[in-house]
Amino acid sequence: MFDIGFWELVVIGVVALVVLGPERLPVAIRTASHWIRLIRSTANSVKAELEQELKLQDLHNDLKKAEQLQMNNLSPELQESIEQLKTAAQSVTRPYEQQNTIQPASAVAEVKEEPVAPISVATPDEEPTVIPAARAQPSAEQGEVKP
């Protein structure tokens, strides 16, 4: 990787032992190995993601070329492979399309209001009034409902 030989590693180990001491050296080695593993895994995931994106781009380019040439009289094997490529491309883009679109019918169904029964409130001094139950708030002092 860095073109470091065995003797260079021995020298680095001896210098680390002298500088850090025998108590802190194992912790430093564990920390360094953890960071190296983390960097390697990140690099591998980025590499795999780039390869996947390049493959998808190649698939899209091949599909565009096939559509531009309008190849209708291809062999059955090529027709089948083109259909597989189309379905693969659609399955890749389908989750993104579903996240961005909102279906109005389902959104309206979720916000359906339920009917509210009115509550009548009467106090000794006033005439009875009727207020909707959704706006009524109980009073903690008297146990009655106030608008």
Curated annotation (Swiss-Prot):
Its main location: membrane. Residues 114-147 are annotated as: Disordered. The keyword Chloroplast does not apply. InterPro entries: TatA/B/E, TatB. The keyword Cell inner membrane applies. GO terms for cellular component: TAT protein transport complex. GO terms for biological process: protein transport by the Tat complex. It is found in: Cell inner membrane. The chain crosses the membrane at residues 1-21. NCBIfam families: tatB (TIGR01410). Belongs to the TatB family. Part of the twin-arginine translocation (Tat) system that transports large folded proteins containing a characteristic twin-arginine motif in their signal peptide across membranes. Together with TatC, TatB is part of a receptor directly interacting with Tat signal peptides. TatB may form an oligomeric binding site that transiently accommodates folded Tat precursor proteins before their translocation. This is Sec-independent protein translocase protein TatB. It comes from Aeromonas hydrophila subsp. hydrophila (strain ATCC 7966 / DSM 30187 / BCRC 13018 / CCUG 14551 / JCM 1027 / KCTC 2358 / NCIMB 9240 / NCTC 8049). The gene is tatB.
